[in-house]
Amino acid sequence: MYAHILLPTDGSELSKMAIREGVDLAKALGARVTVVTVTTPFHVFSGILSMLTDAPEQYGKHMTARAAQYLDVAKKIAAVAGVPCDAVDVEHEHPYQAIIETAQNRGCDAILMASHGRHGMSAIVLGSETLKVLTHSIVPIIVYRQPRASIAQLAAAS
């Protein structure tokens, strides 16, 4: 069915759950995974450039460290399950394009990603990046949604 699954992550809890699901699917299929996180480039929104001399370098260091942290979590999940895993941090202006390009460039035959991530109001129904990947990708997409609480769990919580 699938031999190589791409698992995008933004470090959110739902993204981590999607990675676990993707790793479980890969294990069941005897597939491997590639985990990708996308770092957007530094942008200057202020006209006072003298205040920003160190900002691009600091931003780059921060984003590299954050990406490494997200990828390390995913690699550990895959290692515990015994699933072969590659990890990549891609810098790109548009995360959805980076996800699609990574899937194509690395020969992935499926993308499994969370229904939404960290990005504000647009993430309430279906994340904007997820929607763009669904709209533009020729690689099949599996969208992971957080499971709803069971009636027993809801009753126990009240």
Q: Over which residues does each language-model region extend?
A:
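Short, well-ordered secondary-structure micro-motifs
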Residues: A18, F45-I48, Q97-I100, A123-V125, ...
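Short, hinge-like loop/turn segments at secondary-structure boundaries
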Residues: S50-D54, A103-R106, E129-T130, A157-S158
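Glycine-rich, Arg-bearing micro-motifs that act as flexible, cationic patches
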Residues: A110-H136, S150-L154
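A short acidic, glycine-rich active-site loop
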Residues: D54-Q69
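Short, flexible loop segments at boundaries between secondary-structure elements
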Residues: V139-S150
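Structural beta-alpha unit
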Residues: K76-I111, R148-S158
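Solvent-exposed polar/charged
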Residues: K27, Q104-N105, T135
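Small/aliphatic-rich secondary-structure junction motif
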Residues: A3-D54, I77-D86, S158
